[in-house]
Amino acid sequence: DSEGVRYEEPKLKMMGIEAVKSSTPAPCRTMIKDGLKIMMNGTEEEVIDYIDNCRTKFKALPPEEIAFPRTVSNVKKYHSRTDIYSKGTPIHARGALLFNYYIKKNKLDKKYSLISNGEKIKFIYLKKPNIIQENVVSFIQDFPRELNLDKYIDYDLQFEKSFLEPLKAILDAIGWNVEKTVNLELFFT
């Protein structure tokens, strides 16, 4: 029921969780919502299988779809004269400053606009070591493949932060695991 109106299929009202936050990548929002439905109607085993399937699908998605959307402000404030960014720079702003630096350095500023204050951007985690020796890069709409960073995208960390952590908070509360666990009892049964 919703204020006296009965729905064919019960509607789940979600507030404050990653399934509805605009700062969560869109495919993850859908996967989290579906995961919550399985949690309410299925078994722990079904949830674990669902998470494994989501991990496989996630790793096949392009960077533009799995990156975290944010609005960046104070890009100039965090710029450093000696380094690319100053200490304490938020991760998405650090990614923006790195993007601007490497786009200029590689003379790609005709193809990609530089990121400025108030811009809607996306940021993605990178594995280290990599060619820029940083763990993040931001971009506006299209991932800059010319920087050759595609092979360094940390799909595992992206999946962990955008999908697994939000689900794990709920699974922990109900005492379920996110993956199959082996315990000693299995050896004695």
What residues fall within each predicted segment?
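DNA-dependent DNA polymerase catalytic subunits
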Residues: D1-T189
